[in-house]
Amino acid sequence: LQTWRQMLKLSSREHGLLGGELRLLDRQLQRLQQKELRIAVFGRVGVGKSSLINALINRPLLCTDVAHGSTRIQEAVPWPITSSELNRVDLVDTPGIDEIGADGRARLAARVAMGSDLVLLVVDSDLTSTDLEALKTLLACGKPLQLVLNRSDRWPEQEQSALLQSIRDRLPRDVPVTAAAAAPRRPVLQPDGS
């Protein structure tokens, strides 16, 4: 790819039209050479994207808000895992996709996918039309995709299995699906014993 990119001869008009894509390609090539992996965490507002990243890095680095989503801009966080094949893994927190219109959502999905090596699409229930729309855009970009059903601790095991099957049945093609509880609910014992 590096050789192909170096040999690519484009006119100034073509450079103008393809400038953004070429910069993305150059960044991807640089990350490949430096053995860096970029994982985007994508989904609707309030599904627990930041909580999932906090759970993966094992510390509460990203702000989370119970009332509503709190991520306003993309933010990359290093994932402290060790691997002989990789020098660095970044987890990228993204704003909620349902805070923008359909056209903007499609552009954001494409931009996030093209700038990543893997996309985690996080949901906290069955797939909504917004999830499906984003999923189709992400799949069209050709990047590996993993769907994560977050907050899986909200359902008894049998209901969770049925929900996971419902999600799999609605996917446009074979996409891996996993359940997670990034910030599991913990029972609190009240002074009155309840």
Model-derived segments and spans:
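A structural signal for isolated positions on well-ordered beta-strands in alpha/beta enzyme cores
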Residues: 40, 146, 176-178
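Alpha-helical scaffold elements adjacent to nucleotide-binding pockets in ATP/GTP-utilizing enzyme cores
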Residues: 55, 115, 133-137, 162-170
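Catalytic P-loop NTPase motifs of RecA-like helicase/translocase cores
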Residues: 98-99, 129, 155
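Cofactor-binding loop segments of dinucleotide-utilizing enzymes, especially the Rossmann-like FAD-
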Residues: 44, 124, 150, 182
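Inter-motif core of Ras-like GTPase G domains
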Residues: 102-126, 131-148
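Amphipathic alpha-helical segments in well-structured domains
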Residues: 70, 106-109, 135, 160-164
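Conserved G1/Walker A P-loop phosphate-binding module
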Residues: 1-99, 140
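Canonical P-loop GTPase G-domain recognition
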Residues: 153-194
